[in-house]
Amino acid sequence: SLDGTSSYAIFKDRKERIWVTSMSGVNLYNREKDNFTRIKYLDALTIDIDQDTKGNLWFSTQGKGLFKYHPEKQIWKNYIHDHKNPNSLANNQVNCVLIDTNGEMWVGTMNGLCKYNAEEDAFETLPLEIPSHNICSIIEDQRILWLTTTKGLVRYTPGEGCRVFTKSDGLQSEQFLPNAALKASDGKIYIG
């Protein structure tokens, strides 16, 4: 059965496997047995999942950073914040992860937006001029990143800059929840 009482993300990978995140970590659906297997290595509240072009799955967690997992090789790697290393994650509370249409990985943490450099296996925390660096969700639309934060919605165009939307622009609220955004098949974006 599915572990934990809450699920945060459901993700179908390129091999049609179904992954579900929960309060206790990550679960993999077994179609033949119609049940779930807990991935034992990851014991953390896990919020989001995405898959890179090499087949690695990336899991964002609350408090334990970001995990990379290669399902075929069964190799795990944990990325955490290290205040002595400027190329580490900005914070261990990772709310969301997005692999964009160019294959670039973006990570939303409680302390900023990070961009992953695969060649150097390092992160760059972007110096965005926004009212809150607590990035809750990231959605891509036509190469523009939409970031939800705890103080508004941000439209970020890489290489160009940001525009912040607040209640004065028509938002019902400026506070958003981690990984509570979706781009539907019709192109509409839903945020919460």
Where are the model-predicted features located?
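Carboxylate-rich, polar loop motifs that coordinate divalent cations or form catalytic acidic clusters
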Residues: 1-192
